[in-house]
């Protein structure tokens, strides 16, 4: 009975692990399977591309593991002090945003992740392939994963194409049909993966050089800004260095050298006129931007209209008034 109980317990543990880390197991299995096929091609057609593919595979697995195991960071894990830290994303009264679920204050660019059940520093998105949030502390590893996976797919595509064409053009070639089936599968997989990862890498490169997260790029609250007035856009080089680090020699290496601790970010000087103000400054801004005939409280036809006008701000980019709350996402 003891043996049966132990075996049953072990099986249950294995099933729990498989269920919990299903996507990670699938991802690593695909990487290893593709590399096994690619190495088989290298053994038959030896060239330098095969060595490059092996190096890229090592970098892919390394970055994948680091993205999974590195916590993205949370405001509670930093020296963030809502009373002394300069912030852009504040409430109308100038106070820091407060997360009701975490029961803690949120710093700039932090958002609550329902999957991780905590607030994430500079949250980009929650990725099912990593079972982790992509945030300030692991964003570099995530980007390098995309970058190296893109190069890997292109190199595998080239290597497979060369192997197939050599097989069909060489005289007296004697290659087993099973090899051609595997190579055909590998070629099709590499085509699809290279297309997807090229688009994905270009997209995330664009986000980095414009200092945007995926959440911010998809938010209607940020669509009102141009690149020149985006609050955190301080130039493509400085934007890039915030995540990838100051040293160009470490940009493509999986070392955690992002600048700062993800709490405070330099602001774009061009965006200063459009940044949220305190209640007092908002009131001054409002009075200077609405016609004098309706600026006084006695001019309001109803409490609702008074609230509506006092809680709107002129957006010069959109050419219309917008709710102040929309600026505070």
Swiss-Prot record:
One of its GO terms (biological process) is vacuole fusion, non-autophagic. The chain crosses the membrane at residues 14-34, 49-69, 141-161, 177-197, 243-263. InterPro entries: Palmitoyltrfase_DHHC (IPR001594), PFA4/ZDH16/20/ERF2-like (IPR039859). It catalyses: L-cysteinyl-[protein] + hexadecanoyl-CoA = S-hexadecanoyl-L-cysteinyl-[protein] + CoA. Autopalmitoylated. It is a multi-pass membrane protein. Pfam families: DHHC. Its main location: membrane. Keywords: Acyltransferase, Golgi apparatus, Lipoprotein, Membrane, Palmitate, Transferase, Transmembrane, Transmembrane helix, Vacuole. The keyword Phosphoprotein does not apply. GO terms for molecular function: protein-cysteine S-palmitoyltransferase activity. Palmitoyltransferase specific for VAC8. Palmitoylates VAC8 at one or more of its N-terminal cysteine residues, which is required for its proper membrane localization. This is Palmitoyltransferase pfa3.
């Amino acid at each position: 009975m003891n043996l049966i109980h132990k075996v049953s317990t072990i099986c249950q543990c294995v099933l729990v692990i498989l269920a919990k880390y299903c996507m990670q197991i699938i991802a690593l299995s695909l990487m290893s399977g593709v590399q096994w096929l690619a190495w088989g091609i290298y053994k038959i057609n030896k060239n330098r591309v095969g060595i490059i593919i092996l190096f890229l595979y090592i970098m892919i697995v390394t970055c994948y593991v680091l993205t999974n195991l590195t916590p993205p960071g949370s405001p509670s894990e930093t020296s963030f002090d809502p009373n002394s830290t300069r912030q852009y994303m504040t409430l109308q009264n100038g106070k820091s945003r407060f997360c009701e679920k975490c029961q803690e204050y949120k710093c700039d660019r932090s958002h609550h992740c329902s999957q991780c059940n905590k607030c994430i520093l500079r949250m980009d998105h929650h990725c099912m392939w990593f079972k982790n949030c992509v945030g300030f502390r692991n964003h570099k590893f995530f980007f390098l994963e995309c970058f190296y996976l893109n190069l890997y797919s292109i190199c595998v595509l080239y290597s497979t194409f060369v192997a197939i064409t050599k097989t069909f053009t060489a005289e007296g070639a004697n290659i087993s049909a099973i090899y051609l089936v595997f190579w055909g599968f590998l070629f099709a997989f590499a085509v699809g993966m290279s297309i997807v990862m090229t688009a994905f890498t270009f997209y995330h490169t664009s986000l980095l050089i414009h200092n945007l997260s995926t959440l911010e790029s998809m938010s209607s609250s940020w669509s009102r800004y141009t690149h020149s007035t985006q609050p955190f856009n301080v130039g493509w080089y400085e934007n890039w260095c915030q995540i990838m680090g100051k040293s160009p020699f470490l940009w493509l290496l999986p070392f955690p050298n992002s600048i700062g601790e993800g709490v405070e970010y330099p602001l774009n000087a061009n965006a200063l006129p459009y940044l949220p103000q305190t209640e007092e400054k908002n009131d001054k801004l409002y009075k200077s931007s609405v016609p004098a005939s309706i600026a006084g409280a006695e001019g309001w036809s109803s409490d609702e209209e008074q609230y509506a006008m006092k809680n709107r701000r002129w957006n010069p980019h959109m050419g219309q008034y917008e709710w102040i709350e929309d600026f505070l996402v």
